[in-house]
Design a protein with these regions (language model features):
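Alpha-helical transmembrane bundles and membrane-interface segments of multipass inner-membrane proteins
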Residues: 1-128
Length: 128
């Protein structure tokens, strides 16, 4: 796409991000199911107040990425990675990885700098 900087390169990733933990398909499937369950719980508990919309977007991005990679793993036994920043020799990744990474980074930012402890009380497992 941009010679020497950004290329499309086909790679079959049987591991986690950046090729770690190869051949652990069941583990990744279970992690994805746990993440989706946690997101479903948080969405269920989330007030409909517009203040929580950025949080919902982050959770949906993480879910979309998890589902995208899970579909690849279940249907093919591996995730297809194809985006490669050659300039910095960054590990090959895919769009689902972008969704998970950006969603998680924004989620951390929101929790650290936007929401207060009392905003997050609605997600507590304790009876209120």
């Amino acid at each position: 796409l941009i010679k020497g900087v950004f290329e499309l390169l086909y790679s079959e990733n049987r591991g986690a991000a950046f090729g770690m933990m190869q051949e652990k398909q069941l583990f990744f499937f279970l992690i994805a199911v746990l993440v989706l369950g946690a997101v479903a719980y948080l969405i269920y508990k989330m007030p409909s107040d517009g203040k929580y919309r950025p949080l919902a977007v982050c959770l949906m991005m993480i879910s979309a990425g998890a589902v995208g990679n899970m579909i690849d793993r279940v249907s093919q036994g591996y995730v297809v990675d194809f985006l490669y920043f050659k300039l910095i020799n960054f590990p090959i990744f895919n769009v689902a990885d972008c969704y998970v990474t950006i969603g998680a980074a924004c989620l951390v930012f929101l929790i650290m700098f936007y929401y207060k402890d009392e905003d997050m009380a609605c997600f507590s497992l304790k009876k209120q």
